[in-house]
């Protein structure tokens, strides 16, 4: 039998066995999973990019030049 892979929960650092017995892996529990999700949703975490600009800087709300009525 092979050795079981053990990882640390990204939220609380508790050791977690990486197999079917740990349904929230890599998290130790649903609570830690939701804490992490909340941090991503609040934009406390992000994936680093090479560019420093924010994607929203490139977005603009431009009104239509020639709106056409619906007929």
Swiss-Prot record:
Cofactor entry: Zn(2+)
Record's function text: Inhibits all the catalytic activities of DNA gyrase by preventing its interaction with DNA. Acts by binding directly to the C-terminal domain of GyrB, which probably disrupts DNA binding by the gyrase.
Protein family: Belongs to the DNA gyrase inhibitor YacG family.
Protein name as annotated: DNA gyrase inhibitor YacG
Cofactor note as given: Binds 1 zinc ion.
Assigned keywords, A-Z: Metal-binding, Zinc
Residues annotated as binding Zn(2+): 9, 12, 28, 32
Quaternary structure, from the entry: Interacts with GyrB.
InterPro entries: DNA_gyrase_inhibitor_YacG, Znf_NHR/GATA
Pfam families: YacG
Gene that this polypeptide is encoded by: yacG
Organism from which the protein derives: Proteus mirabilis (strain HI4320)
Biased composition (Acidic residues): 54-64
Matches recorded under SUPFAM superfamilies: Glucocorticoid receptor-like (DNA-binding domain)
GO molecular function: DNA topoisomerase type II (double strand cut, ATP-hydrolyzing) inhibitor activity; zinc ion binding
GO BP: any one term: regulation of DNA-templated transcription
UniProt region (Disordered), positions on chain: 43-71
